[in-house]
A protein has these predicted regions:
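RNA-binding basic/glycine-rich loop and surface signature characteristic of RAMP-family CRISPR effectors
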Residues: 1-350
Length: 350
């Protein structure tokens, strides 16, 4: 009996103070010539600060390089475009984060060397949202000055904020280490040369469950390691703008990790806000309970919930009661322990 197709569904909450994690350029509303605003967006008349999905992915990629030891695919610049090496066999980040590259491939025909243009595309198995404040936030504009030189000081301003921020991600386990080489736009993940190299190095061919062709799949141990590394990197992820003077901790302070047999992400509303201006972030325990009940047929294995002591301590009792009620479905642990135990469960599901 074949295993179910597994999608990792993750939900995180960050807790940051006096930061400016992702800026949006010059603040045209400021009285200062040198003023920078932070990224924010309006919903229902309220302002919410956010970090772009691209920035979060950049931090994630760097964590995999610096803390896990991945060798990242080199970035190649050609006039007004940039692309990675597009070699998911050698570089695990090309596999996990995807790529698109227009390339030329040499081949022999009747003893003569010829070249042909190919474009390889890899849709990322790892999808993620932006990181956005759970509650409405009004950034504060603070000014500083460069005053070490002779003469007048040079003032500049920046926006800062404190917020609880939420983010979602999804990792398609079956896609990791699995590549198609169909000669169709968007479906050619690897060149014929890389396909042959993969087979020679131990990759296998498997039937495409959604097509009539064959897919190339890397050995299980390689796929397991890439998937585990991607999740374990969350324990030490770091990044953000203005870190010299406004350093912030962007590791999760609350996390939910679940294996599911669908691509739907059900945890999007387990945190919400209240107050006259929606200024207070809260954990929606009823919403979490509702998700556990309504999607119980879609979960594969246990759902792991992690919380850092000192963050949302007032929900500890309710979360423990929830774990007792759903003891066959939930494990409630500290953050890193939850990530570690979920990763071990996931290895057996691949």
């Amino acid at each position: 009996m074949s295993k179910e197709r597994v999608k990792v569904q993750g939900y995180v909450l960050l807790d940051v103070d006096v930061v400016a994690l992702n800026n949006a350029g010059k603040d045209t509303m400021s009285n200062f010539d040198n003023a920078v605003k932070t990224k924010s967006i309006y919903k229902n008349g309220n302002n919410y600060v956010y970090v772009s999905g691209q920035a979060w992915r950049f931090w994630w990629r760097e964590a995999l390089q610096k803390n896990i030891g991945w060798t990242l695919s080199p970035v190649i610049r050609d006039k007004n475009i940039a692309f990675t090496n597009a070699d998911p066999l050698t570089y695990p980040d090309d596999d996990i984060f995807g790529y698109m590259r227009a390339a030329t491939e040499e081949y022999e025909e009747k003893g003569k060397k010829k070249s042909r243009n190919i474009t390889v595309t890899r849709v990322s198995p790892l999808k993620n949202s932006v990181l956005v404040s759970v509650a409405s936030v009004r950034p504060v504009s603070n000014w500083s000055s460069m005053a070490r030189q002779d003469g007048d000081s040079v003032p500049y301003a920046r926006q800062e904020y404190s917020a609880i921020m939420k983010g979602m991600f999804s990792l398609d386990v079956d896609m990791v280490g699995t590549f198609s080489d169909y000669n169709r736009s968007g479906y050619k993940n690897i060149s014929e040369t890389l396909r042959e190299k993969a087979i020679n190095e131990g990759a296998s061919e498997i039937a495409d469950p959604f097509g009539t062709g064959k897919l190339v799949r890397l050995p299980l141990a390689i796929r397991q390691k890439r998937i585990a590394d991607t999740l374990l990197a969350l324990k030490n992820i770091s990044g953000g703008a203005m870190q010299t003077n406004n350093m912030g901790d962007v590791t999760p302070k609350f996390i939910v990790l679940a294996s599911m047999n669908t691509g739907n992400h059900p945890f999007s509303h387990i945190s919400t806000s209240r107050g006259d201006r929606d200024e207070q972030a809260i954990l929606n325990i009823n919403g979490l309970r509702e998700v556990l009940d309504e999607y119980k047929e879609n979960f594969i294995g246990k759902v792991f919930i992690g919380r850092r002591s000192g963050f949302f301590d007032n929900y500890d009792k309710e979360l423990k009661e929830l774990a007792e009620k759903y003891n066959d479905l939930i494990e409630y642990l500290p953050i890193n322990a939850a990530i570690d135990k979920y990763t071990e469960q996931l290895k057996s599901q691949i």
